[in-house]
A protein has these predicted regions:
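Eukaryote-skewed repeat-based solenoidal scaffolds used as protein-protein interaction platforms
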Residues: 80-87, 91-94, 102-244
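SEC14/CRAL-TRIO lipid-binding/transfer domains and related phosphoinositide-recognition modules
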Residues: 2-129, 146
Length: 246
């Protein structure tokens, strides 16, 4: 998440204090500040209709609603590749670099109508990589749930996206997520990395133990030891294109 979300200059009180005409650079800086301010305002009330789980010693956790089994579309594609397309019979996923969908975090309301047109949408997947600052991992996990809950409250058909990092993250990673629900789990980018595969498998096992899902939408390569009897697999289109030289 390399994009700036808040710029202190937006409320630094300096507007109107200079007698000289502002330079083009100053005007540009102010415009950027106002845009940043708009982004903050666009998020300040999005959680008004979201329920929260109160957890001692933690911030309230957004509650994501349970999803019953339904007829799945045949194809799952990344947000950045389909958001401006008209094909509605798709499942939208956020399994791509954070920068490709950071705009959803910056201005969630803007994407309510575009996301509603699709058959279903798997919840956002902001990174929680090993080596990231612990607060950033927690924050990204929190916003993954918060945005999913927000879009559910707006009538978008959202699938809970289950994410984690290392075993320490289990203390919060699965909180607020529904039990006995359809869920989605991604494994993109870990095959061939034994440490990453080990951590993924441990988290997968814990997710199934805690959430006891009735159906798992799986994106990416099939991993050994999975519950294939309750899983439906979707191909990683980016990886497919890479393998085909496109």
């Amino acid at each position: 998440m390399g994009d700036t979300i808040f710029n202190p200059d937006f409320i630094d009180g300096s507007e109107g204090m200079h007698s000289e005409a502002p330079s083009p650079r100053t005007k540009k800086h102010r415009r950027a500040g106002y845009r940043t301010g708009d982004l903050v305002l666009n998020k300040q009330d999005i959680l008004d209709n979201v329920e929260f789980l109160t957890v001692p010693g933690q911030l309230p956790i957004p509650i994501v609603k349970r999803v019953e089994p339904f007829e799945l579309p045949l194809q799952a594609l990344p947000f950045s590749k389909v958001i401006n397309k008209d094909n509605k019979d798709l499942m939208v996923v956020f399994y791509e670099p954070d920068t490709n969908f950071a705009r959803v975090l910056h201005n969630p309301k803007r994407y309510v109508k575009p996301l509603k047109k699709f058959s279903c949408v798997v919840g956002p997947d902001f990174s929680q990589k090993i080596g990231m600052n612990e607060f950033m991992r927690y924050s990204n996990n929190w916003w993954n749930k918060a945005l999913t809950a927000f879009y559910q409250s707006q009538g978008v058909f959202m699938i809970p996206n289950v994410t984690w990092s290392d075993p320490a993250s289990y203390a919060y990673a699965f909180m607020g997520l529904p039990k006995h629900s359809v869920i989605a789990i991604n494994c993109t980018g870990i095959k061939g990395n034994h440490a990453a595969m080990y951590l993924w498998r441990k988290g997968y096992e814990e997710a199934l133990r805690v959430l006891d899902p009735i159906l798992i939408i799986r994106y990416g390569d099939k991993m050994s030891g999975e519950r294939e009897d309750i899983s439906i697999y979707f191909e990683n289109i980016n990886l497919k294109n890479l393998r085909n030289g496109r």
